[in-house]
């Protein structure tokens, strides 16, 4: 009951600010509500406050006591939705699939798959030594075990 009510309140807040979107909503047995959100242009503290107020002011503590935590998806968190991939086009990702693990630049993303590009050293077709080649792959989201944005300083 509480989860459905919180989901509806969150949807209403996200409709008012459509650059924000819900990543996860969890409610534990002690009625601790944890909302993780992300945004097309990132998430500010004011965005978290707005979402928190939009939910908290529409729930009755007299009816059911609760605690509320609203956070943004952290930089070290794996990407979990196509919309997160789209906002990170052009950035370097660390991608893990069932059989492989590699770093690549995110070239494009849609609702079903992503396109990645990276440079690899491979043996020359003729003679000794190696040559650098540009590789590209299209990966459906179903093949991705985990993908994180690589932070560079």
Curated annotation (Swiss-Prot):
Biological process terms in GO annotation: ribosomal small subunit biogenesis
InterPro entries reported for this sequence: Ribosome_maturation_RimP, RimP_N, RimP_N_sf
Cellular compartment(s): Cytoplasm
UniProt xrefs under Gene3D superfamilies: RimP-like superfamily, N-terminal (3.30.300.70)
GO cellular component: cytoplasm
Keyword terms of this UniProt record: Cytoplasm, Ribosome biogenesis
Functional summary from the UniProt entry: Required for maturation of 30S ribosomal subunits.
NCBIfam families in alphabetical order: PRK02001.1
Family per similarity comment: Belongs to the RimP family.
Protein name: Ribosome maturation factor RimP
Gene that specifies this protein: rimP
């Amino acid at each position: 009951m509480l989860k459905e009510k919180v989901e509806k309140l969150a949807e209403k807040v996200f409709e008012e600010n459509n650059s924000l979107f819900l990543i996860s909503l969890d409610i534990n047995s002690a009625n601790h509500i944890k909302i993780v959100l992300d945004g097309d242009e990132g998430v500010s503290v004011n965005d978290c406050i707005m979402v928190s107020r939009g939910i908290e002011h529409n729930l009755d503590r007299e009816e059911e006591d609760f605690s509320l935590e609203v956070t943004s998806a952290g930089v070290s968190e794996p990407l979990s939705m196509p919309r997160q991939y789209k906002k990170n086009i052009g950035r370097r990702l660390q991608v893990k699939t069932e059989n492989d693990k590699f770093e690549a630049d995110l070239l494009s993303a849609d609702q079903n798959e992503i396109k990645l590009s990276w440079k690899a050293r491979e043996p020359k077709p003729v003679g000794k030594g190696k040559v650098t080649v540009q590789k590209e792959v299209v990966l459906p989201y179903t093949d991705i075990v985990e993908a994180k944005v690589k932070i560079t300083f």
